[in-house]
Regions:
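Bacterial N-terminal signal peptides that target proteins for export
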Residues: 1-8
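Mature, structured domains of secreted/extracytosolic soluble proteins
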Residues: 20-209
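C-terminal motif of bacterial Sec signal peptides marking the signal peptidase cleavage site
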Residues: 15-19
Length: 209
């Protein structure tokens, strides 16, 4: 009986470990730890979340940006779309692989998420979404020009938790002034030697930027 209990406990721990590793971007808040490697190498280590983004980056000819060898240097911030978002784009457009996406589109999608300065979660200003659905920019926050030339209004906000306003984790919200769509960051402060990654929610869509 004791052996059975120990075996069951081991199985449970294994399942929890796999779940936390595979779906670590579903929960809001900060990602764990620093990564002593380039951003490109970090993406390579987590194929589940970043494989399709890497394929898009390669197709766009922008690997050097994430390896820290481009003119942007080694202090970039990247709002990264996970493979789930890219997979949804392929499905919605009747495509099966990233190679079917036009090169110019790949380049635009990649550069839309690139901010050419290092910004951690606490570096972004607090703000609040406008109560008027026709007004794109709310109060606070800050507007940034991305490497693609698009402008994003970015702010942080603490959500409600257990019915208490402001008791939840601080999250980053990104609003494209082109599309007027707001997107949430799932995990922030993923630090690498060539910049910081803020991973977008799994329900983020490439056209939202």
């Amino acid at each position: 009986m004791k052996r059975i209990k120990l075996f069951a406990a081991a199985c449970l721990l294994t399942l929890i470990s796999v779940s936390c590793t595979q779906y670590n971007f579903e929960d809001s808040g900060e990602a764990n730890g620093n990564h002593n490697c380039t951003m490109w190498e970090y993406f390579s280590k987590d194929a589940y979340n970043w494989k399709l983004l890497q394929e898009m980056i390669t197709r766009a000819g922008l690997e050097d940006v994430f390896k820290g060898t481009s003119s942007y240097g080694k202090d970039i911030t990247y709002f990264g779309a996970t493979s789930n978002s890219i997979r949804a784009y392929l499905f919605e457009n009747g495509m099966k692989t990233v190679d079917e996406i036009p090169v110019d589109d790949c380049k635009a999608f990649v550069l839309n998420g690139l901010l050419t300065k290092r910004k951690m979660l606490d570096d972004f200003k607090e703000g609040r979404k406008s109560s008027d659905p026709n007004v794109t920019i709310g109060t606070g926050g800050e507007t940034f020009e991305m490497a693609s030339g698009k402008q994003f209004w970015v702010y942080t906000f603490r959500d409600t938790y257990s019915g208490v306003p402001g008791a939840g984790p601080k999250r980053i919200y990104v609003t494209s002034l082109d599309t007027s769509k707001e997107s949430a960051v799932a995990s922030s402060n993923i630090q690498t030697l060539t910049g910081v990654v803020h991973s977008m929610d799994y329900d983020f869509r490439l056209r939202d930027f």
